[in-house]
């Protein structure tokens, strides 16, 4: 819901057209969260890996204002992907429990390994529908983990509240919905907290067992 407030973007910063803080956008609902938008009308090659590293280092040099830097990586493995991972020290691989998505995620993990992020990757499985899992029509979290062999840090249900929040331009983190709780739990786990997984099955115990199963289970 912040797109109408964009004046400058990431490319403007690296090209020296504005200062970093001029391009940062804040939201009164999340006063400590800053958004640095990318350029929608410029090619991904407008920024080099070296420029991305320099930009991230500039943000890191101000720890009083910035605790974490989240680089939203574009789909695919083109220049935007390379720019994101070159400055990263940890990767959150987000996938859905579909065969094609898992195949793409496995390829991404291989590229992350080759770029120095091996054993610093965590997995978030998105858009889970437990009714389909129970009918054998969708891969379970365990199935996905068997293939990718990463530490599962989040499991997000396929929740219509996500669509509603996106269309309204409203944050879902902290919301009472299942997806909102799942997002908040991911935040806690990134901070190193031991948070049990939500029972997306609604029957108790399923994701609690997964929590102990996946904790520390990383790719060899």
Residue spans for each PLM region:
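P-loop/Walker-type NTP enzyme "switch/lid" segment
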Residues: 1-64, 164-168, 173
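Electropositive phosphate-/nucleotide-binding environments in soluble metabolic enzymes
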Residues: 4-7, 49, 102, 138, ...
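Conserved phosphate/pyrophosphate-binding and hydrolysis machinery centered on Walker-type P-loop NTPases
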Residues: 49, 74, 81, 172, ...
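Conserved catalytic-core segment of NTP-binding enzymes
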Residues: 51-64, 68-158, 163-164
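C-terminal lobe/tail of nucleotide-utilizing enzymes
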Residues: 114-220
């Amino acid at each position: 819901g912040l797109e109408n407030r964009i004046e400058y973007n990431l490319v403007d910063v690296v090209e020296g057209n504005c200062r970093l803080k001029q391009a940062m956008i804040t939201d009164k609902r999340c006063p400590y969260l800053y958004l640095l938008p990318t350029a929608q009308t410029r090619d991904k090659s407008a920024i080099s890996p070296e420029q991305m590293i320099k930009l991230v280092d500039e943000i890191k040099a101000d720890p009083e204002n910035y605790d974490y830097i989240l680089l939203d990586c574009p789909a695919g493995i083109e220049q935007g992907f390379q720019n994101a991972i070159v400055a990263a020290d940890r990767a959150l691989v987000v996938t859905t429990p579909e065969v094609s998505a898992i195949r793409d995620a496995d390829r991404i993990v291989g590229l992350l390994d080759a770029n120095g992020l091996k054993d610093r990757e965590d997995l978030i499985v998105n858009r889970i529908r437990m009714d389909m899992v129970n009918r054998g029509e969708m891969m379970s979290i365990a199935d996905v983990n068997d293939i990718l062999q990463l530490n599962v840090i989040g499991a997000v249900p396929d929740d219509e509240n996500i669509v509603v929040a996106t269309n309204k331009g409203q944050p879902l983190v902290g919301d009472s919905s299942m997806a909102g709780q799942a997002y908040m739990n991911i935040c806690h786990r990134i901070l190193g907290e031991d948070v049990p997984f939500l029972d997306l099955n609604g029957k108790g115990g399923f994701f609690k067992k997964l929590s102990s199963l996946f904790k520390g289970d990383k790719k060899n």
